[in-house]
UniProtKB/Swiss-Prot annotation:
DNA-binding region ranges: 9-79, 95-163
Post-translational modification: Reduction/oxidation of cysteine residues Cys-23, Cys-45 and Cys-106 and a possible intramolecular disulfide bond involving Cys-23 and Cys-45 give rise to different redox forms with specific functional activities in various cellular compartments: 1- fully reduced HMGB2 (HMGB2C23hC45hC106h), 2- disulfide HMGB2 (HMGB2C23-C45C106h) and 3- sulfonyl HMGB2 (HMGB2C23soC45soC106so).
GO CC annotation, single: perinuclear region of cytoplasm
Compositional bias per record (Basic and acidic residues), positions renumbered to this chain: 52-76, 162-172
Family: Belongs to the HMGB family.
Single biological process term from Gene Ontology: regulation of transcription by RNA polymerase II
InterPro entries, A to Z: HMG_box_dom, HMG_box_dom_sf, HMG_boxA_CS, HMGB
Keyword Transferase among record annotations: no
Composition skew (Acidic residues), residue ranges: 187-207
Protein's name in the database: High mobility group protein B2
Chain spans, region Disordered: 52-102, 162-207
Pfam family, one: HMG_box
Length: 207
């Protein structure tokens, strides 16, 4: 899937991401021993960015252009590892794996973060969502956990019905098929479902 490929070029940074990076460095120099409240820090960065002139933003926009050129150049020479996402065909009728409580939380809050912090990179958005989730009280997490539990319960019923139907269909189509091969299909289906979940997260991050 390429997520762990160490040779894949680092993603390009936006002008706002460079600005936030600069703000972090300034904060570390002024307050080397103090910890950063990420939510408060991001809010201040966003407010400061909105009041900056085009001339002040120009430096960061030039940095972003340079990084985009670097990224485009590296991507031209990048060759993905062989055999990625090949081999198994996914059944479009297979039930999708349910999202976790954290994933439901991210889906709800990501649009607001993008609106409040335009230009924030995918990595910084994910980090902010993670910190927001960890700051939530147990009672605030409960609605997401309850919804995730219901979706998981529904998925388990759906996947059981799907597998029963798949075995029934396989029995009709291939009477000469070895009995042991049916059991082998189940782990593969589980692997496919895990890939589906990872791909959904990647797609949502890239929106």
């Amino acid at each position: 899937m390429g997520k762990g490929d160490p040779n894949k070029p680092r993603g390009k940074m936006s002008s706002y991401a460079y600005f936030v990076q600069t703000c972090r460095e300034e904060h570390k120099k002024k307050h080397p021993d103090s910890s950063v409240n990420f939510a408060e820090f991001s809010r201040k960065c966003s407010e400061r960015w909105k009041t900056m002139s085009s001339k002040e933003k120009g430096k960061f926009e030039e940095m972003a252009k340079g990084d985009k050129a670097r990224y485009d150049r590296e991507m031209k020479n990048y060759v993905p590892p062989k055999g990625e996402k090949k081999g198994k065909k996914k059944d479009p009728n297979a039930p999708k794996r349910p999202p976790s409580a954290f994933f439901l939380f991210c889906s709800e809050h990501r649009p607001k973060i993008k609106n409040d912090h335009p230009g924030l990179s995918i990595g910084d958005t994910a980090k902010k969502l993670g910190e927001m989730w960890s700051e939530q009280l147990a009672k605030d997490k409960q609605p997401y956990e309850q919804k995730a539990a219901k979706l998981k319960e529904k998925y388990e019923k759906d996947i059981a019905a799907y597998r029963a139907k798949s075995k029934s269909d396989a029995g009709k189509k291939g009477p000469g098929r070895p009995a042991g091969s049916k059991k082998k299909a189940e782990p593969e289906e589980e692997e496919e479902e895990e890939e589906d979940e990872e791909e959904e997260e990647e797609e949502e991050d890239e929106e």
